[in-house]
Amino acid sequence: MFAADQTIAKFDPELAAAIAAECQRQEDHIELIASENYTSPAVMEAQGSQLTNKYAEGYPGKRFYGGCEHVDVVEQLAIDRVKQLFGAEYANVQPHSGSQANQAVYFSILKPGDTVMGMNLGHGGHLTHGSPANLSGKMFNIVAYGLNDKEEIDYDDMERVAMETKPKLIIGGASAYALRFDFERMGQIAKKVGAYFMVDMAHYAGLVAAGLYPNPVPHADFVTSTTHKTLRGPRGGIILAKAEFEKSINSNVFPTLQGGPLEHVIAAKAVAFKEALQPAFKEYQQQVLKNAAIMAKTLAERGLRIVSGRTESHVFLVDLRAKGLTGKQADALLGRAHITVNKNAIPNDPETPFVTSGIRIGSPAITTRGFKEAEAIEVANMVADVLDNPNDDALIARIAEKATALCHRFPVYAK
């Protein structure tokens, strides 16, 4: 029997101290990493529930274990809600991550050596879309599409390359592209060359759910996503597809790639999907766009080049070369100022991926805190002040105090 008062603090104070320190960091630091966000207490309550105790291999109504009648309800709620959210015919909510969701699609329709077209990683693509370092790049023949001289996706060149190479699959989506994808055009290109079309909307899913970014579901055979980032749920993945692919996707998630689903995480996904169906979620996403746009504008006014010249989403890249800084240096400097970003390659970056010439900035987390345009401008000016004065330790310390004071005005979790 477990005692009700057997807390982490009592049983494992060393671990409890590390958790408490991270909670304090999240409250005290301005979070600008585009892929990070804060989940609601309800999402965390579901993820920390006794559902973690239950094995449930299989799918609702078709399990390999007994005692699944209640987790069947949980998983079906998640399925029904995410289908409603994105207008999908079919959904699988079991993938443990976005990467595993992508792998399940690949295994459903591809054979080793098949040709796959994805966005160039150096132009903003994602590792799982064909990077040589990833399983996708090791198993398949990868051809890339990228950006033109205006740092916008070149759809005409994409079509030309697709006609020449005849890929079996074309992938839309990115991890560091600020503009909108033309999913309709990409779907047309895929049909023209006889390819499947998959969209990884991990970064944009919350905006899509709110109707503020193009919905790929009507145009794609498969749509994958994470459930955190802009969607503001737990860390995990989903797959949406046309109904004809249900059997193939289900069998490739389980048993090909995974065993038992994480029903406590699926419950947390169900909560997040319900949150995303509320009117307040659209208001939140509208503010995400406003905050990203005003930060990009402010940084441009302070002399920093914004890749692609603007943002049409929650994210944008900043080219640091004019400041004589690398992304690695800027990441460290801003961290000292209690502002968290990540170094990121820019198109045709002369630096290595571990150094980079840019940083990636996103607005989802600060918007969850309650920041609006005034605070976003203040944050952008703090960033610019640090980048303008990388050797001024006193200024960086003052900005750290200022950043923490701003955070305390907008706590993530009210006491």
UniProtKB/Swiss-Prot annotation:
Its cofactor is pyridoxal 5'-phosphate. CDD domains: SHMT (cd00378). Its main location: cytoplasm. The modification N6-(pyridoxal phosphate)lysine is found at K229. Pfam families: SHMT. (6S)-5,6,7,8-tetrahydrofolate binds at L121, G125, H126, L127, T352, P353, F354. The keyword Hydrolase does not apply. It is found in: Cytoplasm. Its EC number is 2.1.2.1. InterPro entries: PyrdxlP-dep_Trfase, PyrdxlP-dep_Trfase_major, PyrdxlP-dep_Trfase_small, Ser_HO-MeTrfase, Ser_HO-MeTrfase-like, Ser_HO-MeTrfase_PLP_BS, SHMT-like_dom. SUPFAM superfamilies: PLP-dependent transferases (SSF53383). Pathway: One-carbon metabolism; tetrahydrofolate interconversion; Amino-acid biosynthesis; glycine biosynthesis; glycine from L-serine: step 1/1. Belongs to the SHMT family. Catalyzes the reversible interconversion of serine and glycine with tetrahydrofolate (THF) serving as the one-carbon carrier. This reaction serves as the major source of one-carbon groups required for the biosynthesis of purines, thymidylate, methionine, and other important biomolecules. Also exhibits THF-independent aldolase activity toward beta-hydroxyamino acids, producing glycine and aldehydes, via a retro-aldol mechanism. HAMAP family: SHMT. Homodimer. This is Serine hydroxymethyltransferase. It comes from Chromobacterium violaceum (strain ATCC 12472 / DSM 30191 / JCM 1249 / CCUG 213 / NBRC 12614 / NCIMB 9131 / NCTC 9757 / MK). The gene is glyA.
